[in-house]
Amino acid sequence: MFSTLLAVFIGGGVGSVARWQLGVKFNSLYPTLPLGTLLANLIGAFVIGGALAFFLRHPHLDQDWKILITTGLCGGLTTFSTFSAEVVMFLQSGQLAAAGLHVLLNLAGSLLMTALAFALVTWVTTH
């Protein structure tokens, strides 16, 4: 039990710091598109897709590794709450196109990145 808590703690800490750094470095570049949030969500989606495929192929690995990557790292890195707040701020300021683009890029992009990583890791581990 302690090792699982430690895995979540370590992964979450690394993911949260990475998300914060992405926001610091990229959110100010385009005021109508918070790139740091988008990058955090796309990278997290790619990582979790690859991790799911990898752990399906390696079920013998300690589950704490899966928890560290999926729940910890990806949970700390990706950010639905920040994304939601940004969309609401766009809507409240009348920036409907920016809100719509932000929703489209985050949702469609995250689904695409998860599927892409899953397919890539599956292909790499079977060839």
Curated annotation (Swiss-Prot):
Pfam families: CRCB (PF02537). InterPro entries: FluC. It is a multi-pass membrane protein. One of its GO terms (biological process) is cellular detoxification of fluoride. It comes from the Bacteria. It catalyses: fluoride(in) = fluoride(out). One of its GO terms (cellular component) is plasma membrane. Keywords: Cell inner membrane, Cell membrane, Ion channel, Ion transport, Membrane, Metal-binding, Sodium, Transmembrane, Transmembrane helix, Transport. The chain crosses the membrane at residues 4-24, 35-55, 71-91, 103-123. This is Fluoride-specific ion channel FluC. It comes from Pectobacterium atrosepticum (strain SCRI 1043 / ATCC BAA-672). The lineage of its organism: Bacteria, Pseudomonadati, Pseudomonadota, Gammaproteobacteria, Enterobacterales. The gene is fluC.
